[in-house]
């Protein structure tokens, strides 16, 4: 059993949400660490994600008992106009705009939206000591064992540390070296994502009447979804994104591919344009998600992937001085998945174990005892949840009718 070597820092690979979160938590607790990131510092992930109370509450507590308001003031997409990232969780029929499903007020989950760029910056700043983040460091190899690991980077830099924390996402370079047999599984789903901006006046005129003060306008159709979400609002501009998603229609679906796309789709597939033209969308979806308008947007084809790691494999990697957090060991599809939330919980739980346990090997074992089942079950749920969110319209209307009948019955009593 190896004792922690406090003269050697913890080496964190990846400066995404989980990497920055655990870097900040370790730094705040006096545990030396270095965060390495392959990308340049100006890389952008400007879209927003949903944070659930079971994720952000643990993070806020671990950061010293910060208030939710302290976070939303820094990360909410609508923070510049006094918003708090509120989400109404309403599902609307995207062909009529009418409400299909609305959560009960008493049972509404606590969910907020956060701009990813802002969330990363906020976490990095949540402490007295600056984080040591080294960009332009793409991992080449790792070697050694727990207590004494070496990381070599493509730029020639070499570092020794007590342990490597793999926070490098679904395509984890660390995982591909120590557990090469665990590879991402591509789910048979179609997802196109577009980013655009409008003036504040246009937003108030065209989107606000339907979305209100919420940050997501969830539109569901007959087996497909068209959410429009707020990424960032300023006094003059509103940055928005839309998604068009549905299950793949067999192997010959012209919109489904397992090939990794370029960063941005330059030439939109004719099949996508024709499919969108056939959807009789209501406003405001029709205004922004149509064959003509989307050609002026930045459009991306997203591949939905899952990563599932058995506990035995995770513990085997630990013997080589590697511990996993975030998408590197539990990637989930962006629709129906809660990967970002589990990544934050991973960071909190691993940091807590490392602070409490002087023995590195024991700290990792304690972390996996709590995290493995949580994450494995979340990956399993995420596979089916995509299809639940993309059900036929007849099922959505049946759910809506049953809820109305239940509400009417409760009012009588």
Curated annotation (Swiss-Prot):
GO terms for molecular function: FAD binding; monooxygenase activity. This is FAD-dependent monooxygenase vrtH. Keywords: FAD, Flavoprotein, Glycoprotein, Monooxygenase, Oxidoreductase, Signal. GO terms for biological process: terpenoid biosynthetic process; viridicatumtoxin biosynthetic process. Glycans are attached at residues 5, 94, 232. It comes from the Eukaryota. PANTHER family: FAD-DEPENDENT MONOOXYGENASE APTC (PTHR47178:SF4), MONOOXYGENASE, FAD-BINDING (PTHR47178). The keyword Heme does not apply. Pathway: Secondary metabolite biosynthesis; terpenoid biosynthesis. FAD binds at residues 37, 48, 120, 327, 340.
């Amino acid at each position: 059993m190896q004792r922690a070597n406090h003269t050697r820092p913890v080496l964190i690979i990846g400066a995404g949400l989980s990497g920055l979160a655990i870097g900040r938590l370790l730094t705040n607790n006096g545990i030396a660490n270095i965060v390495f990131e392959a990308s340049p510092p100006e890389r952008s992930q400007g879209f927003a994600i949903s944070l659930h109370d079971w994720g952000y509450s643990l993070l806020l507590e671990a950061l010293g008992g910060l208030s939710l308001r302290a976070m939303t003031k820094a990360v909410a997409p609508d923070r510049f106009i006094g918003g708090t990232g509120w989400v109404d969780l309403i599902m609307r029929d995207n062909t009529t705009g009418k409400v299909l499903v609305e959560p009960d007020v008493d049972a509404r989950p606590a969910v907020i939206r956060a701009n990813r760029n802002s969330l990363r910056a906020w976490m990095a700043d949540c402490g007295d000591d600056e984080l040591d983040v080294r960009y332009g460091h793409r991992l080449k190899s790792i070697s050694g064992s727990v207590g004494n690991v070496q990381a070599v980077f493509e730029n020639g830099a070499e570092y020794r540390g007590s342990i490597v924390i793999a926070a490098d996402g679904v395509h984890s370079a660390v995982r591909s070296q120590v557990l090469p047999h665990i590879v991402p599984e591509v789910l048979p789903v179609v997802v196109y994502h577009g980013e655009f901006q409008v003036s504040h006046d246009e937003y108030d005129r065209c989107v606000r009447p339907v979305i209100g003060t919420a940050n997501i306008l969830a539109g569901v159709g007959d087996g497909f979804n068209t959410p429009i979400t707020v990424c960032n609002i300023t006094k003059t501009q509103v940055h928005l994104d839309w998604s068009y998603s549905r299950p793949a229609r067999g192997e010959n679906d012209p919109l489904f591919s397992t090939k990794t796309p370029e960063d941005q789709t330059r030439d939109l597939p004719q099949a996508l344009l024709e499919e969108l033209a056939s959807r009789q969308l209501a406003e405001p979806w029709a205004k922004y998600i149509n064959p003509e308008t989307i050609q002026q947007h930045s459009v991306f084809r997203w591949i939905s992937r899952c990563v599932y790691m058995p506990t035995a494999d995770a513990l085997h990697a630990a013997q080589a001085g590697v511990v996993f957090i975030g998408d590197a060991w539990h990637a989930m599809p962006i629709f129906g998945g809660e990967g970002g939330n589990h990544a934050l919980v991973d960071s909190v739980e691993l940091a807590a174990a490392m602070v409490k346990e002087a023995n590195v090997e024991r700290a990792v074992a304690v972390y996996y005892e709590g995290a493995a089942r949580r994450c494995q079950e979340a990956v399993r749920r995420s596979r089916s949840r995509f299809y639940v969110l993309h059900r036929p319209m007849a099922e959505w209307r049946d759910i809506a009718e049953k809820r109305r009948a239940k509400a009417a019955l409760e009012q009588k009593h």
